[in-house]
Amino acid sequence: MMKTRKLEIEGKNFSAVEIGTPHGTILLIRGSKSILGCGYFSIETANRLGDRFALVTGVRNWDDMLNASVKDASSPALEAGVHPGSSTGREALLLMENS
């Protein structure tokens, strides 16, 4: 099953997607310039494509994603100011959108 929702964070609009799998859930939040994803996704692919992507793990829903510490980030996300280990998902999205 797939769910979608619109989110607004500090005046910025994002689309959130949740896709159930047989053994878990795939979670993604997408802005106009940013992507926040769960552990199902690959930093290597984001780097190859040049996407601003931050990765959070151990999350079960969109609120968890926004509050979790970023575990890893693509090179373009790092250049936008995302700091794995100290930035939250919410902060990462805003940094990637605002730069």
Where are these regions (language model features)?
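Residues that scaffold, gate, or flank divalent-cation-dependent active/transport sites
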Residues: 1-99
